[in-house]
């Protein structure tokens, strides 16, 4: 199989969008600013919150979906033993070493995962998937060609995973899907939500004609309208639910109407899958060949994301 440059690019793009979120870290987490003796940090402007909210709707679903795709690609070609060894070196050791480094910067060891939490959860998915992949029935289910009806059912499930995550996390408040802080702070709802996208990536590996269909101009136009409508409804829902919040940094301590929270969660689920499919289609249409620039971007995106936090905070502090 030739290298899929469209998916390489999209995975790297999703990872690098984390820099756009973390660029405002001093405003989102005042405790970080306090460590640099910066007090009275104002809350982020609304446009900053809008950018963070928009990117957060699709970034991690896209990342885990493509991780599932590339996982089964390697597993199918190289075998389980090679696959697990490779992922332990590339993902698990990177997570452990760099998370440890970031953890001890404040002088204490709290077993926090920092911004590398997704590597920790991805390694859990990889180990679990490697085990269940040995089951013949599971292999047959995920490797079958899916009909439009089955694909529609999968989409519905992915939409439901967001409100389901709220329920599983026993948390009918806004930031129920916030990442875990430590290795021991895993949230069942988050795992179900992200693992569902991981499995979707596996299914797409066996149904790669879907990429061509999503790249068709008429499908892209339809998806773009659906995405815009979905996000407009999400903005309106968020305004109804959280419009009275004066400082979003204290949102975890506030209570909201459970019905509005669940509606907002459904809309987030719709946005997650719609934007994910749209971005796959757009990448498939625009990125069709290799180039030196693309290789550079793909190769550097992972190490840049792993180490970017400290340089970014230092630069933010200097220009604060």
Labelled PLM ranges:
Residues 1-320:
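Alpha-helical transmembrane segments and their immediate juxtamembrane cytosolic regions
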């Amino acid at each position: 199989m030739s290298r899929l440059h469209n998916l390489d690019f999209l995975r790297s793009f999703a990872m690098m969008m984390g820099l756009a979120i973390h660029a405002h870290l001093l405003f989102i987490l005042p405790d970080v600013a306090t460590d640099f003796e910066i007090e009275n940090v104002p809350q982020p402007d609304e446009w900053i919150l809008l950018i963070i909210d928009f990117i957060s709707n699709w970034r991690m679903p896209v990342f885990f979906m493509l991780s599932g795709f590339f996982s089964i690609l390697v597993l199918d070609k190289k075998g389980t033993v090679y696959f697990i060894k490779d992922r332990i070196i590339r993902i698990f050791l990177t997570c452990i070493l760099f998370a440890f480094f970031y953890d001890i910067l404040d002088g204490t060891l709290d077993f926090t995962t920092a911004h590398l939490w997704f590597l920790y959860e991805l390694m859990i998915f990889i180990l679990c998937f490697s085990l269940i992949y040995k089951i013949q029935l599971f292999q047959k289910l995920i490797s079958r060609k899916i009909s439009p009806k089955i694909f529609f059912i999968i989409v519905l499930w992915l939409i439901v995973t967001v409100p389901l995550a709220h329920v599983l996390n026993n948390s009918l408040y806004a930031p129920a899907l916030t990442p875990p802080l430590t290795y021991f702070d895993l949230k069942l709802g988050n795992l179900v939500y992200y693992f569902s996208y991981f499995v979707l990536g596996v299914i797409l590996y066996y149904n790669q004609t879907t990429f061509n269909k999503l790249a068709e101009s008429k499908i892209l136009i339809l998806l773009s309208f659906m995405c815009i409508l979905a996000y407009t409804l999400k903005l309106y829902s968020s305004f109804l639910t959280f419009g009275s919040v004066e400082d979003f940094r204290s949102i975890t301590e506030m209570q909201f109407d459970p019905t509005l929270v669940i509606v907002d969660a459904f809309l987030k689920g719709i946005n997650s899958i719609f934007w994910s499919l749209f971005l796959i289609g757009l990448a498939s249409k625009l990125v069709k060949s290799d180039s030196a620039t693309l290789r550079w971007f793909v190769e550097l995106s992972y190490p840049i994301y792993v180490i970017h936090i400290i340089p970014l905070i230092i630069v933010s502090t200097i220009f604060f």
